[in-house]
Amino acid sequence: MGNKANLIFLWAMLVSVVVMATRHRPFQRTKGINGLEKIIVRDPRGRSFEVYLYGGQVTSWKNEKGEDLLFMSTKYANTGPLPSHGFVRQRFWKIDANPPPLSSHPSSTAHIDLILKSSEADLKIWPHKFVYRLRVALGHGGDLTLTSRIRNSDVKLFNFTFGLHPYFSVSDISQIQVEGLQNLDYLDQLKNRTRFTDHGKFITFNSQLARLYLRTPNKIRIMDHKKKKTIVVRKEGQADAVVWNSWDKKVVDLGVEDYRRFVAVEPVEVEKPIILKPGQEWKAIFQVSVVPSGCSRKSCIPHT
């Protein structure tokens, strides 16, 4: 998906975050995998998410019943190849104690803010100065929202591609349908990025699938028939979307049967790189909620 320079901001899982106290300080600092520090954020109803300061990866999002709505591989190790996901997930992010105000941001019951500034070491990898701010928030209905802001702090123009990599927990991949991408063009990653048009009503899974859908709508639905729920993905500022499942193909950081329990629907901006002039800022919003399958679109209430 573009050259290595353009992949600077691609992440694994759900991206990077930084911690800031909310009104009732609903977070806990503790140790996670490999002794790395992680932050657990809770809202007044007991819903939560957790993030690692190294790489800032969101590794858990739980509803009030304690059910995790994100997928975590049994072999997760917070590592991965740079060319696929950029270097920001291999950096320690800092707490943004005084972030600039966010316009048109969904209201939240708990949130944290992170910041990452390019270092001298980073400039040797990608020679452009930037400031990346990220807010991760829980909404009143339990929805999870990630708001990314990237500012060009350099004296020259630069361009980049961008992507989040959420893996959603599902009952059984063979029972999953992805809706909202019908009649769109996509690049098939398993066929040398050959371009096709999807004429199906929805996407189902019976083998390995890796597609980059182009110019996608702002809402995509993942229907889990066994659990009778629908995961609703909403996005702004990310025109494309990746749909992926490894099926039974060997992947370094996946267990043998892990493929059955997740689906990746990833908001990305890769077909047309983002261009920022000095001082300009780009913003993207990613929001995910869970609703009962079959409810009317006007009356659906997230039950995360």
Spans of features found by a protein language model:
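Beta-strand-rich N-terminal accessory domains
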Residues: 2-76, 216-239, 280-302
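Extended, loop-rich substrate-binding clefts of extracytoplasmic carbohydrate-active enzymes
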Residues: 33, 82-141
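Asparagine-centered strand-capping/turn motif at beta-strand->loop junctions
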Residues: 51, 138, 148-154, 290
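Plant-skewed but cross-kingdom recognition/interaction modules and surfaces
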Residues: 97, 235-253
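Hydrophobic core residues within well-ordered beta-strands of beta-rich domains
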Residues: 132, 144-146, 282
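Active-site/ligand-binding surface loops and adjacent short beta/alpha elements
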Residues: 157-159, 163-241
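Short, basic/aromatic beta-hairpin or loop at an interaction surface
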Residues: 253-264
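Intrinsically disordered, low-complexity Pro/Gly/Ser/Thr-rich segments with frequent PxxP/GP/PP motifs
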Residues: 270-283
